[in-house]
Amino acid sequence: MAKRSKAYEAAVAKIEADKVYAPIEAITLAKDTNPSKFDATVEVAFRLGVDPRKADQMVRGTVNLPHGTGKTARVLVFATGDKAEAAIAAGADFVGSDDLIEKIAAGWTDFDAAVATPDLMGKVGRLGKVLGPRNLMPNPKTGTVTPDVTKAVNDIKGGKIDFRVDKHSNLHFIIGKVSFDVNKLAENYAAALEEVLRLKPSASKGRYIQKATVATTFGPGITVDPNVTKVLVDA
């Protein structure tokens, strides 16, 4: 196991190992214990009481973070004609059809989100083995298979993120940067938590959110009380 840096060990020392923190406390502590000199990402992870191998327990959706993630997403749009022009005008980073499909089929995935017009999904669907594992496959349930490419690009650029529970029953969200005000991070956290709770599968029995953790990119995890659904921000 790699030896932790002195900065990391100092950060860990500020955290009470067995304490479950209120969200605002955890976020404040995450900022305070960030061991990196750069503007690190603040992330939250939820461990869910679901079995993602079962279709009726899959948790997948989108959330519009009120303050964005602090990162401008690179958006790819599969479109032609007027829709392609609209995507370019909206600020999409990559726009095309057959050319992009061939490039991705060869292994290229240097983008953060993908949108497709419905007429191209027959071709785009063949990229499932490349895009699926990376959660990049356009999906009508997340608003990324749509004729309204302008809205889709604007939503993603504005802080809309897709999420899907992984095979270990975990969900991961970026809720901002260390440079964000604590209140903005707390409001982003609250938006993510609210959507996860809304999407609880009826087939999920017992405790739904089993654990919640907040951490910076290279910082220690801080356990958050998932039962606190209303995040009180600092005045």
From Swiss-Prot:
One of its GO terms (biological process) is regulation of translation. SUPFAM superfamilies: Ribosomal protein L1. It comes from the Bacteria. GO terms for molecular function: rRNA binding; structural constituent of ribosome; tRNA binding. PROSITE patterns: RIBOSOMAL_L1 (PS01199). Gene3D superfamilies: 3.30.190.20, 3.40.50.790. Disulfide bonds: none annotated. One of its GO terms (cellular component) is large ribosomal subunit. Pfam families: Ribosomal_L1 (PF00687). CDD domains: Ribosomal_L1. Transmembrane segments: none annotated. Keywords: Repressor, Ribonucleoprotein, Ribosomal protein, RNA-binding, rRNA-binding, Translation regulation, tRNA-binding. Part of the 50S ribosomal subunit. PANTHER family: 54S RIBOSOMAL PROTEIN L1, MITOCHONDRIAL, LARGE RIBOSOMAL SUBUNIT PROTEIN UL1M. Belongs to the universal ribosomal protein uL1 family. Binds directly to 23S rRNA. The L1 stalk is quite mobile in the ribosome, and is involved in E site tRNA release. This is Large ribosomal subunit protein uL1. It comes from Paenarthrobacter aurescens (strain TC1). The gene is rplA.
